[in-house]
């Protein structure tokens, strides 16, 4: 499919039908071919092999064009702010089987996590939080500071064989556990929690579950209803193919009023706002009156969010859903299998559980400087940490990219 066919397919969004019964969530017509891999949809320079989407995912061409149009509108004397911010939320909601009313914008994943922990009013009580060492390091810093500053009881389960055993979680979750906080897919090695099993365990002991889904949303099927997860958050610059400064927070509808306390306030939470001091205003006891929106927006959004990123997501979220998350998930499995077979033969031992199907696979590494030099010479981009190497293929990668990586390390 050429670029014109792609753009035409995306332009058809305006006339598409509602998908999955969720208002505002639409999909292009089924005649558009979205087979994988999709190299032509991305402007990755010729000769460069990028297998590092768990770090930052490249924008597809349609997203880049949307951002260009937005930037042009910002330089115009007549500002065009035309975009449907609620439609973008509906698209994300459909991606994880949530209701749009359960979704709010946040600047990033960490803000979402802070809103949940603060809203549950855990600090200053005898309650505890359970997490694990494969959770996002920024979240572990957050919980560690709460422990240091306020004495919060934080219980961290350590991995065994590079996975978190549900039985180890079971040993530390008790009736005083207020929150179980995990990454659905671990950023370090791609370990995947069985989200439903974790939720069933936590709920059986009266605890809630927060999941960081940044390394899963857009590449791994997520069903918040089926899993029972209470809260989830992610930024959009990774597998949602968006940009920095914008993310989503999911809060289960029945917990909005009953459990999660509102901890910040701002005008974006108002469903209606009325002045009472201007000419022609109705009289009032105060200069302003307002009604808060009853949904997640009315609880957690404070002010303006990243408009440029929202424009990008207007293109990328329908793009992801048209390809199909299940197809994205299936596409990478032969690539992961090849890596896990060949990398150990080259001296890179796997630290990803063999049953993992996530988009991340990692390997131990010696002589970092030599590895960096080899990859640089071959124009291959993967994450090289101090003592491990992480590979994360996406929709534009194929077996040729994997072979180029293997050749560079041979």
Language model features by range: what are they?
Residues 1-7:
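Twin-arginine (Tat) signal peptide motif
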Residues 7-410:
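Pyridoxal 5′-phosphate
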């Amino acid at each position: 499919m050429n670029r014109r066919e792609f753009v035409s397919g995306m332009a058809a969004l305006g006339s598409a039908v509602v998908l999955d019964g969720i208002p505002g969530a639409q999909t292009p017509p089924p005649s558009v071919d979205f087979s994988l891999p999709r190299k032509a949809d991305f402007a990755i320079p010729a000769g460069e092999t990028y297998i590092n989407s768990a770090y930052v995912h490249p924008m597809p061409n349609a997203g880049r064009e949307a951002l260009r149009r937005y930037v042009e509108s910002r330089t115009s004397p007549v500002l065009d702010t035309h975009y449907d911010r609620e439609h973008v939320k509906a698209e994300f909601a459909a991606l994880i089987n949530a209701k749009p009313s359960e979704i709010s914008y946040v600047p990033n994943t960490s803000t979402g996590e802070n809103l949940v922990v603060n809203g549950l009013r855990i600090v200053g009580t005898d309650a505890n939080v359970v997490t694990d060492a494969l959770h996002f390091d920024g979240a572990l810093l957050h919980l560690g500071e709460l422990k240091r500053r306020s004495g919060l009881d934080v219980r961290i389960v350590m991995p065994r064989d590079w996975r978190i055993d549900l039985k180890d979680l079971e040993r530390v979750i008790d009736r005083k556990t207020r929150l179980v906080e995990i990454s659905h897919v671990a950023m370090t090695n791609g370990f995947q929690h069985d989200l439903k099993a974790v939720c069933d365990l936590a709920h059986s002991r009266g605890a809630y579950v927060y999941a960081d889904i940044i390394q899963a949303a857009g590449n791994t099927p997520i069903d918040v209803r089926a899993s029972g997860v209470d809260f989830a958050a992610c930024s959009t610059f990774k597998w949602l193919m968006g940009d920095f400064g914008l993310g989503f927070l999911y809060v289960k509808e029945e917990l909005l009023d009953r459990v999660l306390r509102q901890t910040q306030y701002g005008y974006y939470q108002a469903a209606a706002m009325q002045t009472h001091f201007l000419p022609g205003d109705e009289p009032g006891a105060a200069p302003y009156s307002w009604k808060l929106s009853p949904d997640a927006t009315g609880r957690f959004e404070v002010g303006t969010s990243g408009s440029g990123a929202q424009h990008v997501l207007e293109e990328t979220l329908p793009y992801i859903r048209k390809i199909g998350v299940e197809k994205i998930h299936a596409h990478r499995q032969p690539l992961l299998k090849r890596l896990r077979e060949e990398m150990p033969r080259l001296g890179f031992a796997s630290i990803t559980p063999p049953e993992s199907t996530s988009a991340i696979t990692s390997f131990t590494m010696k002589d970092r400087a030599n590895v960096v030099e080899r990859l640089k010479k071959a124009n291959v981009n993967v994450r090289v940490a101090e003592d491990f190497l992480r590979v994360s293929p996406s929709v534009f990668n194929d077996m040729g990219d994997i072979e180029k990586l293997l050749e560079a390390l041979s």
